[in-house]
């Protein structure tokens, strides 16, 4: 079964608590991924907090997202 994000909750800074479809829960630090043009706006913590679940992963209004497998392995 491929991992899929079912819940996500902002913790602080660039940390998001993520729950996956197999019940696994993790607090993930997204800061290491905030490089390159698509992720640059996410360096603003106000913008970073605008994430949403776009099944099967977490995404932002500008189209940025990170593969759910990458999140699961983090």
Regions found by a protein language model. Give the residues of each.
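Motif-centric detector for short Cys/His coordination patterns
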Residues: 1-74
